[in-house]
């Protein structure tokens, strides 16, 4: 799956639009961005996430899209088709846990996706918009979801480094 996402990302990069692409090892689906928190709060979040129960399931990655919209792309992504409902259910559990801890409710609607690139300029933008139109229904493939993870994002000049703090596995719970 990573190879397919990488080839799609590379096709986007070949449009010549200034962008920052996501490295292969950083492809992921964000259920909820939390922001900066202390280590004790992160530990409490991890412990509470352990209450989430789910079975392994598959998600279908399909459709190239962009935020805020395809004709004004700032973030280019691959969407989730099949399995999106189960992702939403898990995300709702995460949201319930966070709001019970005093975090503000997420204002934006949840659109499960894998980010491929962040657009940094307008040069050659029509080529990217055309590609987004042509690949709006592209089928990338399916992947099994077997865990959810609380990640720390460490920002560097070379790009983010993601470190797993806690992991909840399907059909059981616990942290790693």
UniProtKB/Swiss-Prot annotation:
SUPFAM superfamilies for this protein: LigT-like
Parts of the chain that traverse the membrane: none
Chain span(s) of sequence motif HXTX 1: 28-31
Example GO molecular function: RNA 2',3'-cyclic 3'-phosphodiesterase activity
Keywords for the protein's UniProt record, in alphabetical order: Hydrolase
Entry EC no(s): 3.1.4.58
Family: Belongs to the 2H phosphoesterase superfamily. ThpR family.
Protein name: RNA 2',3'-cyclic phosphodiesterase
Organism the protein comes from: Aeropyrum pernix (strain ATCC 700893 / DSM 11879 / JCM 9820 / NBRC 100138 / K1)
């Amino acid at each position: 799956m990573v190879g397919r996402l990488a080839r799609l990302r590379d096709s986007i990069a070949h449009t010549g639009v200034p962008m920052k692409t996501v490295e292969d090892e950083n492809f992921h689906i964000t259920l909820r961005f939390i922001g900066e928190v202390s280590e004790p709060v992160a530990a409490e979040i991890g412990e509470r996430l352990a209450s989430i129960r789910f079975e392994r399931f598959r998600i279908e990655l399909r459709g190239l899209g962009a935020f805020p919209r395809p004709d004004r792309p700032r973030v280019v992504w691959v969407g989730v088709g099949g399995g999106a409902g189960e992702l939403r259910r898990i995300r709702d559990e995460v949201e319930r846990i966070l709001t019970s801890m005093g975090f503000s409710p997420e204002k934006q609607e949840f659109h499960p996706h894998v980010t491929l690139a962040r657009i940094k300029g307008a040069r050659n933008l029509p080529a990217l918009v055309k590609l987004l139109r042509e690949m709006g229904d592209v089928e990338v493939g399916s992947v099994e979801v077997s865990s959810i993870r609380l990640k720390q994002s460490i920002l560097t000049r070379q790009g983010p480094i993601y470190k797993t703090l806690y992991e909840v596995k399907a059909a059981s719970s616990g942290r790693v």
